[in-house]
Amino acid sequence: MKLSKKQARLRRATKFRAKHAQGSTKRLCVHKTAQHIYAQIISPCGTKVLASASTLTAKLKNGGNVDAATKVGKEIAKAATSVKVIKVAFDRSGFKYHGRVKALADAAREGGLDF
């Protein structure tokens, strides 16, 4: 039976998380909806959020587009460096590395994150 788009995305996300579950690297986890984009840096054990940024904040309230994703990427990089996190694994949650996800990743790299 063919998987739906959502099931296929969740399957890709699960595969990544299973591979990196035992690692000692923190994850930069990205989630996007039609109107917003969210980014979190999660501890290696997966139980604690170390830093977060999204388009729900007052500064980035209007927009879920590529420009807003770039701003979220810069914001998450700034928040990560404030808690002394530099090296992360990029968890795109099964989304294609294209458009808003790519813009967020590029901005986070420019901000000082290494992945």
From Swiss-Prot:
Pfam families: Ribosomal_L18p (PF00861). It comes from the Bacteria. The keyword Cytoplasm does not apply. GO terms for biological process: translation. Gene3D superfamilies: 3.30.420.100. Keywords: Ribonucleoprotein, Ribosomal protein, RNA-binding, rRNA-binding. Part of the 50S ribosomal subunit; part of the 5S rRNA/L5/L18/L25 subcomplex. Contacts the 5S and 23S rRNAs. This is one of the proteins that bind and probably mediate the attachment of the 5S RNA into the large ribosomal subunit, where it forms part of the central protuberance. Belongs to the universal ribosomal protein uL18 family. This is Large ribosomal subunit protein uL18.
